[in-house]
Amino acid sequence: MRVSSILSLATSLVSVVQAHTLFTTLYINDVKQGQGDGTCVRENTDLAHANSPVRDLSSDDMACGIGGTVPVNYTCPAPAGAKLTFEYRLNPSKAGQGFIDESHKGPVAVYAKRISSPSADAAGSGWFKLWGEGYDMEADKWATEKIIETNGLISIQIPTALPAGNYLFRPEVVAMHNVTPEVEPQFYIGCAQVFLESSVTGDLNVPSEKSVSIPGYLKKDDPSVIYNIYTDEEYAHPKKPYPMMGPEPFVPAAVSKAASGKVTRQSEGGIPDSCLLVNGNWCGVEVPSYKDDLQGCWNAVKNCWSQADACWAQQLASGGRNCEVWGGKCKDLDSHCSAKDFTGPPAYELKSDDYPAPGPIPAAFNAGDTPQDTSSSTEAPSTTKVVVISSVPVTVTVIPTPTPSTSASLEPIPDFTPRPTSTNTAQPSQTSKPKPHCGGRRRMRTR
């Protein structure tokens, strides 16, 4: 017996341009946050163009990317001085396929902004840079080329002197390959919602010359914006230095804390303990229990599939693999009800379908610039893992990472797990591809 009123899940066949990139995954102290990808990350919700760049310097999308003005459900806690790592992907839903096309050269930076709550507006004043790199003349490499070598992983250390509270951490990857007097760079931006747990409290005082408004921190005629990476002058010897975008990094002075300093902990926006499985910023909770109750059994099945429907509806560009995992639980419930087992819910092992990191997580790029806490006391530890409390066992299974290619093709590739079209979660074949979207023909560098 099955419930005829269970909603059918619509098919979503979308794809992205393989030359581009998207920030999909947050690590805190080398630990992936949540289950799957996208937890605590503001991603572009237009799945068909998820890794498309921001091109308008005056747009609010410059703050946290396209659609990034909308907060996500969860904020991840991080202890003072933690290392944050931002994973970028060519194909948002498939790890290990590269970072960005090698032709897309330019600077990389990480900004931060303290906010009053996770729902606060990202656009506007209060942004400051934690780290940035442009063109390394000695190594003859752009920052993007170095991040290709780290498999799209960008690591920074949170300065220990930053006061506790809600922050947006904003990685910024810029591609300069198509820049002309009429064409602006391509910005690949995202934001991670993080609550910094620390015994440092009070106001955050950033010098005016290092505090910027986003949008507004760049102008169309800035030397860093109109810089042409292909002209002979820039590749002459000696090479012409690249004028880095934005302000100089802000490094707060070291602080000294008393041994009894109280650590401010996160009180809102965390992942609830009732979550059995997480996909991005969706979580599944246990269905209502029932005992010797036929209708209660089928109501539980309906509840489960309703949650699966919500999972697919809320899937991010980083995919819906755990929506498929949750569907397995629903099918198991269905089979128990069909077998007239009307007491439950039955135990079911949920295995998060996680990709491992695409390579070794690099050390913080700004580690040498960040002063350490001078106190001898040890701050109380803060967890950065999601702890799931449930009567149903939950384990994590790591699936193998595809071998990254040495150079990325410019052909568009299918992206995202399609939604199942019925309650048996069968997946349709992928039948469409998008047109390439890269802002014009690639110019060859001249010497």
Where are these regions (language model features)?
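A short tyrosine-centered beta-strand micro-motif
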Residues: Y167-P171
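Peripheral, solvent-exposed domain-edge segments
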Residues: R2-I6, L13-V108, S116-T150, V183-Q186, ...
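Surface-exposed loops/turns
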Residues: A80, P163-A164
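Short, well-structured alpha-helical interface segments that form or flank functional binding sites
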Residues: L153, N166, I189
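Short, solvent-exposed loop/turn segments at the edges of extracellular beta-sandwich modules
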Residues: N178-P181
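Beta-strand-rich extracellular modules
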Residues: E172-M176
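Signal that preferentially marks extracellular ectodomain short beta-strand elements
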Residues: G152-L162
